[in-house]
Design a protein with these regions (language model features):
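FNR/FR-type flavoprotein reductase catalytic core
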Residues: 69-160
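Ferredoxin-reductase
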Residues: 2-81
Length: 160
């Protein structure tokens, strides 16, 4: 775990009440896909845990859904805003324990951490396949991951 100050470089809507936030800062404590960060939000007592979608040494990408006061405040942040994060929390996924053709299955806000996992599996030469089954979708705007996948080189099967 490492505490650090990060700068918002992007905070954009990708689906109904769902945003992708990119933060610049020292992400060296994040070592496995599936880990999470705790975000300190000004004026609120408790930090908010948010899973890491993707990262590298100098950046963290979070995908979050606006469901309460904390995430509502996060959704209003603009590039240049500073956030205090605890990084490298949780055990994450053991990408080395997978077979040659891992199957990644997810839904809702549980899908974003699979992006970082798939990216690392593919970099290791594995043929990761994603399967997303969407239940009770009332509006296309409520589908969380399709926009991010549109620019992704990783194959996915999406069914509604």
């Amino acid at each position: 775990m490492k505490k650090g100050l990060f700068t918002v470089t992007e905070n954009v809507s990708i689906a109904d009440r769902t945003l992708r936030m990119t933060l610049a800062g020292n992400a060296s404590a994040i070592v496995r896909p599936g880990q999470f960060v705790n975000v300190e939000i000004e004026g609120l007592y408790l930090r908010r845990p948010i899973s890491v979608c993707d990262w590298d040494a100098g950046k963290v990408v979070l995908v979050y859904k606006v469901v309460g006061a904390g995430t509502q405040k996060l959704s209003r942040l603009r590039p240049g805003a500073a956030l205090d994060l605890l990084t490298g929390l949780g055990n994450g996924f053991d990408a080395g324990a997978s077979g040659a053709r891992p199957l990644l299955v997810g839904g809702g806000v549980g899908v974003p951490p699979l992006y970082g996992l798939a990216k690392r599996l593919m970099a290791a030469g594995k043929q990761a396949e994603w399967t997303f089954r969407l239940f009770r979708v009332t509006l296309p705007s409520s589908v969380v991951f399709i926009e991010m996948h549109g620019s992704s080189p990783y194959p996915a099967n999406i069914s509604i």
